[in-house]
């Protein structure tokens, strides 16, 4: 096996170990949603929201960590932050800027928006996890976080689709999402341009994961605790 292959195998083992440790600490994987072999298992909406909120918080934590690490290692002195304003592919989706704005939106619309943002990240996260391996001397900590975020975003999307199906009467909502066409930017030959593309994508990921985290807390408070939070 090549050194790179051995390194990647070790990376994925590290992903499993660290993610299981962190998720267990957060209480996300403490119990299966339904016991194996159970029939007609019905998980409460409150429990579904508990898991979604914990998972979204974990994703935002990882997104902040990977952005900060990338910023410190590759972005210093390059002026990336001044160019990274309003450059997110999800900007086409009208999203509340904070909890106060989110509280003004009907819960079904806010649920659809959460699902739409999560769907919008499916494709870019898949390519982030693969293309980040091509960055010169990329540390394993950045690599495994990219892989882990992609996996956990899929888990959160699946959980949110269950919540939407439970909350919505009849129609499970429109399949809204924002298309991402940034793969060529992650493969540019010019190093500065390529690194900025990664920086901008991670900057947007941190921003959107924070929004999702806030929206889910608002939704949980409204739907589970009757806004008494």
UniProtKB/Swiss-Prot annotation:
GO terms for cellular component: extracellular space. It is found in: Secreted. InterPro entries: 4_helix_cytokine-like_core, Somatotropin/Prolactin, Somatotropin_CS. Residues 1-30 form the signal peptide. Its main location: secreted. Pfam families: Hormone_1. GO terms for molecular function: hormone activity. Belongs to the somatotropin/prolactin family. This is Prolactin. The gene is PRL.
